Amino acid sequence: MPFVELETNLPAERLPPGLPLKLCEATATILGKPAERVNVTVRSGMPMVLAGSAEPCAQLLVSSIGVVGSAQQNQGHSARFFDFLTTELGLGPERIVIRFYPLEPWQIGKNRTVMTFL
């Protein structure tokens, strides 16, 4: 069950239409998870500074069980997420940062229990 949070200082009107759904589909493909299990949040117009500059930028937080737990996995994921974000947001790769967080099944609650028991 991946969780993806995109934060950017770009105003909402500069984001492409349907970005949350596109990011959901891209995440499913990149991480090899069904889109029905992907959770996406997009926050625009955030006050942000990246590398000492308030120029347009974005950060992506990717949390998931079993697919973001190694440098080798995340190197491949990073390249594919960067391709998606630079295309969709019109930002250079130097204005984007990605953080990966591996999760354990007991850390995600769903249907009145945790994923460990589902």
UniProtKB/Swiss-Prot annotation:
Recorded GO CC terms: cytoplasm; extracellular space
EC number: 4.1.1.84
GO biological process, one term: melanin biosynthetic process
Keywords assigned: Acetylation, Cytoplasm, Lyase, Melanin biosynthesis
Broad EC category: lyase
Catalytic activity: D-dopachrome + H(+) = 5,6-dihydroxyindole + CO2
The keyword Cytoplasm appears for this protein: yes
Subcellular location field: Cytoplasm
Domain of life: Eukaryota
Keyword Cytoplasm: yes
Annotated GO MF terms: D-dopachrome decarboxylase activity; phenylpyruvate tautomerase activity
UniProt signal peptide: none
Principal localisation: cytoplasm
N-acetylproline: modified positions: 2
Gene3D superfamilies: Macrophage Migration Inhibitory Factor (3.30.429.10)
Any single Pfam family the record assigns to this protein: MIF
Family as reported in the entry's similarity comment: Belongs to the MIF family.
Reported function: Tautomerization of D-dopachrome with decarboxylation to give 5,6-dihydroxyindole (DHI).
Subunit structure: Homotrimer.
This protein's name: D-dopachrome decarboxylase
Originating species: Gallus gallus
Organism classification: Eukaryota, Metazoa, Chordata, Craniata, Vertebrata
